[in-house]
Amino acid sequence: MSTWANLGLQDSASPLMEQLIFFHDHALLILVMITVLVGYLMFMLFFNSYVNRFLLHGQLIEMIWTILPAIILLFIAMPSLRLLYLLDEINEPSITLKSIGHQWYWSYEYSDFNNVEFDSYMIPTNELSNDGFRLLDVDNRIVLPMNSQIRILVTAADVIHSWTVPALGVKVDGTPGRLNQTNFFINRPGLFYGQCSEICGANHSFMPIVIESVPVNYFIKWISNSVNS
């Protein structure tokens, strides 16, 4: 989900997303180098009038084009495996948020507090304010503290959904009868937008997600008002 005139990924708002962007750039660099090398070899092959009689059957060249791709794959696989383990690791979360996907809205529960739960619907275009984002703004945002480890539990009430926020590097499938979890750490304040990323019916495109990241003291005030109300 890119923003206006943006050809790359969104600006990261979590350490894990920063690592994902680094891995993307790392893999892209390797792919560009391979493309340039293969393009150069093909160019030289087409425009070269000489023939190498050992090219089609030579042990040295066969060893090179067998071992070299294996080494290149290792350079891609090792950072990828490291990232996979980092994404699955849960580091003593400060807050647990439960997200339940419905057709076609999200329900949220703050599991550490009593009676803090709400539904989050997309604001229709005809009710949107001038500074709102079409198909992205919701009536009830998720409010979370910055610089805190957050655990999110994701499930669904009807069909398979997917809770996704690109700026945080988070994508968790919500499956009926099953509870999936992941964690993230928001390192700056702001509004972060996401959408359901699993086709879930006619109004799949109208299930946005909005996270409002605030300092811890503001979050405490917000949660106190929510509990008292």
Curated annotation (Swiss-Prot):
Name this protein carries in UniProt: Cytochrome c oxidase subunit 2
Classification of source organism: Eukaryota, Metazoa, Ecdysozoa, Arthropoda, Hexapoda
Annotated source species: Drosophila persimilis
Binding site for Cu cation A1: 161, 196, 200, 207
Cofactor(s) this protein requires: Cu cation
Coarse class of the protein's main subcellular location: mitochondrion
Regions of this protein lying in the Mitochondrial intermembrane compartment: 1-26, 83-229
Topology with respect to the bilayer: Multi-pass membrane protein
GO terms for cellular component: mitochondrial inner membrane
Membership in a protein family: Belongs to the cytochrome c oxidase subunit 2 family.
